[in-house]
Amino acid sequence: MFLKILEPCDFSRGRFRIENFIESSKYAQNLFKIQNEIIQNVKDESLAENVPIITDEVLNYMIFTAKNIKAGNILEIGTATGYSGLFLARVANENGGFLTTMEIDEKRYGKAVENFKKLGLFEKNRMILGDALEEIPRLDKGIKYDFIFIHASKGQYLKFFEMSYELLNENGIIFIDNLMFRGLVAVKKEEIPKRYKTIVKRLKEFIEKLNEEYNFVLLPFGDGVGIVKK
């Protein structure tokens, strides 16, 4: 482990007011500019249809990280409509590699394929329709990945992680989004709605496992970002 879970700001001493934190998040989001009309449309349509996509500040940091490690082959678990994948595919292609992205929902997969084709990225990358738990074992074991992005079914995060970690290059990074699950992972047990107790319990156990056994850091922005370096 190179870093432990980051300590929150000390709001009680007035060093950093909660409203300032919210404004800081908005400011960070606004720094991320989409300079492509097609990608902007993908984002707008996804939000309009309530498709969960990565937030701007998390996406900005993820792409910054992938670029800085010069990620070639990239694996994405959870394509959705292809929004984050469009950015990752361009990073992979620029570094001489390709993106492999998986989506279980047929409708979203079809939309993602359409979006990739609009940007000329479909033929350069690999898009898979299917359950990642079944598709990951079918991947070529001879191909290793520099960067892996997990943002699919949270109840399966541990399985996704363990399966994909075996495919990660040395010094490669696994980037895991939405670890805090609407912030519920951080609240007291009695404050968690009954319908979310199981998923929150699983996420807490997953985070604790990563923190104890892997080179891991949890970043408290977006809805919680976990990073593991091999």
Predicted regions and their residues:
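A short alpha-helical cap/connector motif
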Residues: 1-147, 154-175, 179-230
